[in-house]
Curated annotation (Swiss-Prot):
Disulfide bonds: none annotated. The modification N6-acetyllysine is found at residue 68. The lineage of its organism: Eukaryota, Metazoa, Chordata, Craniata, Vertebrata. One of its GO terms (molecular function) is 2-oxoglutaramate amidase activity. This is Omega-amidase NIT2.
């Protein structure tokens, strides 16, 4: 298959976990009725985003929230990228994305590698590392359409992760993410377009909808970018579903027209994976 429909769910997050999960499943069903074959939820889709919330909302995987995702993926016969949730495992907390196949099987689990620790004086200070531990592995999964590579939010700033995924044959990179009102307007779209052009892949980001009353205000603007760096679809700040038809023939054409993979000077430099 050379094309398929991708859907990104820009969900309004509340403080009530069960409501978030129920509403996420409702939007997933709606996306499936519109022909979406791969659907992504946003970062921290079942929880407010913030260090103080992670311990309270954390679950095992499998657990309550991911069981619902497994069920709805099977019901709708889709590939479901479950945004992320705070995961508890062996006394540690992680920011984790679980992926489910059309039969409800857990296909992949990705723990955010690069924790969001920043300090922009007078604007925003945040330290995920106060409560979360970093993941230590890459994660891809295969579909009948293409291979998909996973990252979460801050991971998008690290070009090496995207390069390794491209080397491993990924044609679509999906980053559930929640940039903020400082970094969002400056870097959200720029980073997506950069990763797409650098690696000649499709890049998709799924953000929570903006809630100006939240302790952490998400930028929104869930986006799909093609390998030419063009924005194919983009949400505003409100709750929405973003749809984009992914054309893999277009990707192949771009790679043929500008064959950077064949032109890389591997005799001079390399980006390599040190741990599978």
């Amino acid at each position: 298959m050379t094309s398929f429909r991708l859907a990104l769910i820009q969900l309004q997050i509340s403080s009530i976990k069960s409501d978030n999960v129920t509403r996420a499943c409702s939007f997933i069903r709606e996306a499936a009725t519109q022909g979406a074959k791969i659907v992504s939820l946003p970062e921290c889709f079942n929880s407010p985003y913030g260090a103080k919330y992670f311990p309270e909302y954390a679950e095992k995987i499998p657990g309550e929230s991911t069981q619902k995702l497994s069920e709805v993926a099977k019901e709708c016969s889709i590939y479901l990228i479950g945004g992320s949730i705070p995961e508890e495992d062996a006394g540690k907390l992680y920011n984790t994305c679980a992926v489910f196949g059309p039969d409800g099987t857990l296909l992949a689990k990705y723990r955010k590698i690069h924790l969001f620790d920043i300090d922009v004086p007078g604007k925003i200070t945040f330290q995920e590392s106060k409560t979360l531990s970093p993941g230590d592995s890459f994660s891809t999964f295969d579909t009948p359409y293409c291979r998909v590579g996973l990252g979460i939010c801050y991971d998008m700033r690290f070009a090496e992760l995207a390069q390794i995924y491209a080397q491993r044959g990924c044609q679509l990179l999906v980053y559930p993410g929640a940039f903020n009102l400082t970094t969002g307007p400056a870097h959200w779209e720029l980073l997506q377009r950069s990763r797409a052009v650098d690696n000649q892949v499709y890049v998709a980001t799924a953000s929570p909808a903006r809630d100006d009353k939240a302790s952490y205000v998400a930028w929104g603007h869930s986006t799909v970018v093609n390998p030419w760096g063009e924005v194919l679809a983009k949400a505003g700040t409100e709750e929405a579903i973003v749809y984009s038809d992914i054309d893999l023939k277009k990707l192949a054409e771009i790679r043929q027209q500008i064959p950077v993979f064949r032109q890389k000077r591997s005799d001079l430099y390399a980006v390599e994976m040190k741990k599978p």
